[in-house]
A protein has these predicted regions:
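Catalytic domains that recognize anionic headgroups
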Residues: 1-193
Length: 193
């Protein structure tokens, strides 16, 4: 199902998620989840195509402790750059469909990363002692004008939320609100929208 243009040596980049996605649209309301490789380490250099490599030199091994801190950071920053590019492709894809569908994209990472600070790498420390950079994650929202209109969302109000702190507990309840799903399990106070 994936194009070889987005794969190299058995490793597929996140863009492969968009290959043939249009063929899966049914014409009905759909909820699509794209689960990326994103910036998951330790093999950061395998998460983006060579064309996205702008920060050099990079760590080319999954043994991060064998690389300089700057090489690890450069490889990780290239993954962030590629994720930004990938999200722009998702938005482009959604934009071409907004005349037929109300489209929305929500991007959230499952965790942050340690890149060698205090000799810590990757993620997964117990929450109570995990450094902030393992707990802070991006949360990006984009929606078509039709979605804003039909859900009566106010862009200015959403922009004002950018400095508030939320956590993953908000995601489930926010999706219920966004998609106008009513259930006794919903907790409207956790819906950020």
């Amino acid at each position: 199902l994936v194009s070889s243009a987005h794969c190299k040596d058995g490793n597929c980049y996140d863009e492969a998620l968009l290959d043939k996605l249009s063929n899966r649209l049914t014409g009905r309301n759909q909820f699509i989840v794209l689960h990326q490789n994103g910036s998951h380490g330790p093999a950061y250099d395998q998460r983006y195509p060579e064309s996205m490599r702008v920060y050099n030199p990079v760590c080319n091994t999954n043994k991060l402790q064998d690389c300089s801190t700057q090489e690890v950071i450069n490889a990780y920053d290239n993954t962030i750059r590629y994720t930004d590019y990938f999200l722009s492709k998702v938005i482009d894809w959604l934009t071409t469909r907004q005349s037929a569908y109300n489209t929305v994209m929500v991007y959230v990472s499952d965790h942050g990363e340690s890149l060698g600070e205090n000799n810590l790498y990757l993620h997964g420390m117990p929450y109570a002692i995990a450094p902030r950079n393992q707990k802070n994650v991006p949360f990006i929202f984009w929606a078509s004008s039709g979605f804003y209109r039909d859900r009566d969302l106010n862009k200015e109000c959403l922009v004002n939320l950018k400095n508030k702190e939320f956590n993953h507990d908000n995601i489930f309840h926010s999706f219920l609100g966004l998609l106008d799903i009513h259930t006794r399990h919903a907790k409207p106070e956790r819906d950020i929208y």
